[in-house]
Amino acid sequence: MSPRRRAFLASAAATGIAAFGRLRPLHAADAEIEIDPSQPGPTISPHVYGHFIEHLGGVVYDGIWVGRDSKVPNVGGIRQQFVDDMKRIGAPNLRWPGGCFADGYHWRDGIGAAGKRPRTYNYWEHRMPTGRHAVESNAFGIHEFMRLCRLVGAEPYVAANVGSGTPREFHDWMSYCNAPPGTLSLADERAANGDEEPFNVKYWGVGNESWGCGGNMTGGEYATEYRKFISQVPVYVRPFFVATGPRGHSADGDVGWTEGFFGGLQNVRGLGVRVDGFALHYYTDFRQTAEDGAKFDEKGWYAVLHKGAHIEQVIQDHWAIMGRFDPQHRTKLVIDEWGNWYRGGTELGPEYILSQTITLRDALHAAMTFDVFNRHADKIEMANVAQTINCLHSLFAAVGDRYTRTPAYYTFEMYRPHMGGRLVPVRIGLPQVTVPLLEGSGRLPALSGSASVRDRSVTVTLTNPSLRESVVTRIRLAGGARLREARATVLTHPDMRATNTFEKPDEVVPMALAAPVSGDTAALTIPRQAVVAASFHLA
């Protein structure tokens, strides 16, 4: 436990109040919040709290794969602390090997004896001036990836190569992964390489960003390729196919891609084309601004949260288009790349391309994003933060034997109770507020959140984006429910730019928050620039 957290808990125990100020009486509230656990809705897929790793910069090599002979504590070459922390948040899935890397990756290069694997070309490292892995060692292949998934307890999500691969290569990879022992020659080869039992990979991405790095196609052109790749696939495990979707952060939301792809599938009759998931990417993209991940002012704080919140509209827009072609909505959204993307300048080192400082702002952005995903549980099968370690909106930073959790990690930890819960209605009695942006102004919810129920426990998560004002809430459970007890944690810091470093790894960590209960009502004070998670146990 960090000294800061220990001191806080001692203070809270001694005074009976939160360190952010004494609670007002239950009847004196800034916001009335009503939650109705008697009206459970769709289940929140655990997979919306998913992860993404790629052969880029320090993500796989050094971040995760340190090598079997490394002095860094490891399990068969995989960083031990990474495994432990991923287990702690119940990481439900891992997407690999890309990203753009996937459409240049040929899976056979990553199997067999490590010393005999070919050294191959990594286009994305080569095109980066400071990339150090332009020559891909292939030390981390499908067997190492599956070992990582088993250690963590995560389900594999494999992105296949459409951009430079073939349907045959894809089908062989599926067979290599999933064919039972003693059936195909590919199953024998897998066993000879150390894994007799099948990997049982269910989730398969059919390419990645095929509108760009994955082939520079139109939606209609990709529809043709998609049909080829999923035809005559080996079905040892019923696959969940994820088709390449739009670049949702583009100016128009890239709605033309969605229309073109589903329209292209409609032109084919009688082939039974199945699309289980549709991959929407949404980056809160600030690469063209003067600010970076560490240096920002009030306008920069609000601009990132405001643009991040726009993902909700993008989800609704593409869902509506999908519904025109698929009225029953058999195809679900898979938001397999999301997160903040700043201009360079705060990398861990020149070779750690696309790494960036992760601050309290990024933790709140993640919280608001998760609440959007929860509220649209009927639409979203999976989501994957980009990326889990040493890249963009990362949960961890690692360089050699130095390692830390970022503030964003704790958002995942605090939201874990939502996984597999059923969404319940939550009404927050606060209007939106006007906030300054980098250009002009915009509107943000004064308080945003979501709620879920599981057994006799209700989880509510709330984010206060204000840099100035705390919010005192009175939370009432509707439907005749009564509270037995409540427990709450808060993630905040007096400095909006606060981050965790190798030297100060516990600067931004969750702390206990007072949550007094009376009958069907609880009180929470949400500090400024904070995210709160509360669990209410029903009588």
Residues of each region from the PLM?
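Active-site His/acidic residue clusters
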Residues: 284-302
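Non-catalytic accessory regions flanking glycosidase/transglycosidase catalytic cores in CAZymes
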Residues: 9-21, 26-277, 311-312, 316-344, ...
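Beta-strand-rich domain onsets/edges
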Residues: 306-307
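N-terminal secretory signal peptides
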Residues: 1-3, 14
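Histidine-centered catalytic micro-motifs
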Residues: 280
